[in-house]
């Protein structure tokens, strides 16, 4: 619904009755806050993990068997594993959410000036209604979307909404206004803007959440609350996108594989043993149906045991511990991770779509270069030396401006603020310089004249200072010959670098439009952050493509892209034209492409300028459709929809509340370099999860084979339920802590991103799991045979079973070293003493095993062992497991060196 601004009396504003009617008709000026997830729902969500779901099924089956056998220890262990895994994830996400809420508080009670009942008054922002006449001036935040009917030198900082740091606003004629009103500026990417090709929003509209940087104006409110441009963007940013993270996809796939493999093995084992029993056991030829049922039940329980043992109980705990520890560590490096899986997903990222203003640049205009004129020759009675000439220029900068500085921060026009900051850098106090001058007359800047002039009295002399567009100001000066050529070449150089250019001139006496004395030209820009080019280069080395999506002009966007390294620094005119056609597009042009055309362009794009929120969101969706894992960075409200739709959204700590709410990670230090660090953390985390999977599945496979082996030879399981509980849950928890606490490796940044479709268990991991699991089973089986033949009698006693249990645990203990160095040619002992978490866990496992063996007694079916037995088992298992692992890595190191030669 479009409001007719003519329905408001501009001179009087709305009366009390009209306010009530408008509030009922159009609503309040309040943005609907994002719906908070209740603590209960957040906790329940943790049970939707695919591995957890399998564990719950296993726990239920185990519970049924527990009632039959009257043994609840294993069942309790599985339920404990489920509880711990879900609670860890819930606790850390809730903790991060608490920290995050502090960053996203929204103030709807901010006072704004309105004209009501013929008087100017201040009311809270929430009380504004459609049709209100609002008054805005320097420093104000625009409270609602409004249409200007009066504007004096009005300039708006739209960087939070469009990426454009300074937009000049003016009153349009009726035809232009009508065209602007017919346009939807936010959500429909099939519309084309009514304004110019290089404009994001019409010049007569001021939008909620933008800041007034210069001038003042009056406007009629046309949209409030969720109907404002920022309201539409907020709704988009809060939509549930249902985008699954790469790790979720991999864990789903692993869960299906484990459940299928476990069911198949259990079914085959059940059928095989039952058929063998039918063929060899005479009971099947009798009428003892109760005995037959007992045999079937025994084999069925064995099959269920196989299914339960196939499930890696420690995996959810390991994943959540790894993610949670990463959250804590990344917070220390100024990355506030809100969602557990976001830290790992950064490691799978293939494309980063980044905003420009505030993300790549400092969002602070500064003087990049200044070309000052030499001391002029004597003219009439004007005679300057170097000191007096510089002082006159400093005075020109101090008085011929509308800006101020507040503790070094510009207030007002950011371009003029940059000049004052440059003045301070030269050791000049602009306030003191102003005190030395008396302003006689001031001619403000306007879009028609394109210059500003100030006449002052200094030391009983009158001077006029002029500042403005170089093409206007230089025509007023006496500049000629080589001096003129040098200035024009300098200006051309500034413009090539997408700088804003200004020229300065002066004269004695009142203003005259010719024969001014040229003082200087300057190039002003929003500088690139110092660490950005190196961070972009790091991303490129890691195989990640960086795309810039900004609301700024094409020339500025391409130049910044060139400075940070996503656009060639040197190319001729022909190449530049070719690159612009392939790698660059404006938001309006992108919105006019069909879905097929946009899909093809999305992969090639490096820079999108004049982008609107829907354009960014569409680009992200198309990249995801093409199989890319997309991270989006941004600080403005305009970035929020894309942040929400991306696999990982990264907002800046200084960004808007809407952007932060839509993101998964907040960069507290506003540094793009933190993104490269997040990628390194994510990739290292994924490797740590793979290491734990290797370790856990070796344990499960060897235990599974022992159950099968015991059934084949007709003996009871040599490991008790409590012993398996120690191996599968407690020890695995220690292993999860150890492997999750391994520090990130910078070597991962030299690798290409993994394919989203690549299974979390690689072929080499499968080979290692099968080899180690089978080897451990064979070793333990041989150990059982040795115990039978060399023990006291044919029955294996408790002492021998204790030796068996300790040997099995020590095999897994040493295998932890192999897991640590998995996928690397480096020794498992490389940086060993730096991995404090691993060292501590190894000590805890040894201590725990000693306590269980020494004091476990009947509960763990153990007897104390002598020191000789301890040393023999530790040395023997270490030699076999660690020795073979180190030998294999040594062979691989030699192979790599041979290939390099």
Language model features by range: what are they?
Residues 793-801:
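Membrane-interfacial loop- and helix-cap regions that link adjacent transmembrane helices
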Residues 1-753, 760-761, 774, 789, ...:
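Conserved cytosolic headpiece of P-type ATPases
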Residues 755-769:
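Hydrophobic alpha-helical transmembrane segments and their immediately adjacent juxtamembrane loops
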Residues 782-792:
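Juxtamembrane and boundary regions of transmembrane helices in multi-pass small-molecule transporters
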Residues 767-783, 810:
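Alpha-helical transmembrane segments of multi-pass integral membrane proteins
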Residues 731, 776-777, 801-817:
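Generic alpha-helical transmembrane segments
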């Amino acid at each position: 619904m479009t409001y007719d601004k003519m329905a408001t009396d501009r001179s009087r504003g709305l009366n009390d009755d009209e306010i009530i009617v408008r509030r009922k008709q159009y609503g309040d000026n309040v943005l609907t806050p994002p719906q908070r997830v209740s603590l209960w729902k957040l906790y329940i969500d943790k049970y939707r993990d695919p591995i957890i779901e399998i564990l719950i099924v296993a726990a239920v089956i185990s519970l049924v068997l527990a009632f039959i056998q009257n043994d609840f220890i294993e069942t309790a262990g599985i339920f404990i594993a489920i509880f711990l895994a879900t609670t860890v994830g819930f606790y850390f996400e809730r903790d991060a959410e608490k920290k995050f809420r502090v960053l996203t508080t929204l103030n709807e009670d901010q006072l704004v000036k309105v004209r009501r009942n013929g008087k100017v008054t201040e009311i809270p922002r929430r009380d504004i209604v459609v049709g209100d006449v609002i008054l805005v001036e320097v420093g104000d935040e625009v409270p609602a979307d409004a249409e200007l009917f009066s504007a004096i030198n009005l300039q708006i900082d739209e960087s939070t909404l469009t990426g454009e740091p300074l937009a000049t606003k003016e009153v349009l004629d009726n035809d232009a206004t009508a065209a602007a009103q017919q346009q939807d500026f936010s959500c429909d990417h099939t519309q084309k803007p009514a304004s110019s090709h290089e404009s994001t929003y019409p010049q007569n509209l001021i939008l909620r959440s933008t800041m007034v940087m210069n001038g003042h104006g009056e406007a009629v409110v046309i949209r409030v609350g969720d109907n404002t441009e920022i309201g539409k963007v907020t709704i988009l940013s809060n939509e549930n996108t249902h985008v699954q993270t790469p790790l979720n996809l991999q864990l789903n796939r692993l869960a299906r594989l484990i459940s299928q493999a476990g069911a198949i093995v259990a079914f085959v084992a059940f059928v095989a043993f039952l058929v063998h029993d039918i063929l060899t056991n005479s009971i099947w030829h009798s009428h003892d149906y109760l005995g037959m049922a007992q045999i079937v039940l025994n084999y069925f329980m064995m099959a269920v045991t196989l299914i339960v043992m196939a499930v890696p109980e420690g995996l959810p705990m390991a994943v959540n511990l790894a993610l949670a520890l990463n959250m804590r560590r990344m917070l220390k490096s100024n990355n506030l991770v809100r969602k557990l899986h976001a830290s790992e997903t950064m490691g799978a990222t293939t494309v980063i779509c980044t905003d420009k203003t505030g993300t790549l640049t400092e969002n602070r205009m500064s003087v990049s270069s200044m070309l000052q004129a030499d001391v002029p020759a004597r003219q009439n009675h004007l005679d300057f030396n170097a000191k007096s000439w510089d002082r006159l220029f400093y005075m020109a900068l101090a008085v011929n401006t509308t800006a101020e500085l507040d503790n070094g921060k510009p207030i007002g026009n950011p371009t003029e603020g940059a000049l004052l900051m440059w003045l301070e850098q030269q050791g000049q106090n602009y306030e003191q310089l102003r005190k030395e001058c008396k302003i006689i007359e001031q001619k403000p800047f306007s879009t028609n004249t394109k210059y500003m002039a100030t006449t002052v009295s200094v030391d009983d002399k009158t001077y006029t200072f002029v500042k403005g567009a170089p093409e206007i100001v230089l025509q007023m000066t006496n500049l000629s010959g080589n001096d003129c050529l040098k200035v024009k070449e300098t200006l051309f150089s500034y413009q090539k670098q997408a700088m804003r250019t200004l020229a300065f001139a002066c004269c004695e006496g009142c203003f005259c439009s010719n024969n001014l004395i040229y003082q200087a030209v300057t190039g002003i820009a929003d500088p690139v952050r110092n660490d950005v080019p190196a961070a972009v280069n790091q991303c490129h080395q890691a195989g990640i493509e960086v795309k810039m999506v900004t609301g700024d002009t094409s020339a500025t966007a391409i130049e910044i892209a060139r400075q940070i390294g996503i656009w060639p620094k040197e190319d001729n005119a022909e190449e530049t034209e070719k690159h612009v056609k392939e790698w660059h597009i404006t938001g309006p042009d992108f919105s006019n492409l069909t879905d097929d055309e946009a899909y093809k362009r999305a992969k090639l794009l490096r820079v999108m300028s004049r982008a609107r929120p829907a354009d960014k969101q569409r680009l992200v969706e198309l990249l995801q459709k093409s199989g890319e894992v997309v991270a989006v960075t941004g600080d403005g409200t305009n970035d929020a929809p894309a942040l929400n739709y991306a696999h990982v959204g990264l907002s800046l700590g200084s960004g808007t509340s809407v952007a932060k709410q839509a993101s998964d990670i907040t960069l507290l230090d506003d540094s793009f370099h933190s993104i490269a660090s997040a990628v390194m953390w994510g990739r290292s985390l994924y490797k740590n999860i793979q290491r734990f999977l290797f370790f856990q599945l070796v344990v499960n496979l060897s235990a599974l084979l022992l159950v099968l082996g015991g059934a084949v030879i007709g003996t009871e399981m040599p490991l008790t339920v409590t012993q398996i509980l120690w191996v599968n849950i407690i020890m695995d928890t220690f292993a999860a802590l150890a492997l999750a606490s391994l520090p990130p490796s910078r070597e991962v940044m030299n690798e290409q991103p993994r394919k989203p479709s690549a299974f979390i268990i690689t072929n080499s991991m499968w080979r290692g799991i099968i080899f180690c699991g089978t080897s451990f089973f064979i070793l333990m089986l041989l150990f059982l045979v040795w115990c039978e033949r060399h023990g006291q009698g044919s029955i294996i006693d408790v002492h021998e079973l204790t030796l068996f249990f300790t040997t099995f645990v020590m095999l897994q203990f040493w295998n932890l070293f192999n897991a640590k160095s998995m996928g690397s040619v480096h020794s498992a002992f490389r940086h060993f003493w730096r991995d404090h978490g691993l060292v501590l866990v190894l000590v805890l496992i040894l201590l725990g095993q000693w306590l269980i063996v020494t004091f476990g007694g009947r509960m763990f079916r153990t007897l104390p062992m002598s020191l000789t037995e301890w040393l023999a088992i530790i040395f023997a298992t270490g030699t076999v497991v660690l020795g073979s692992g180190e030998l294999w890595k040594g062979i691989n190191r030699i192979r790599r060196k041979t290939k390099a030669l």
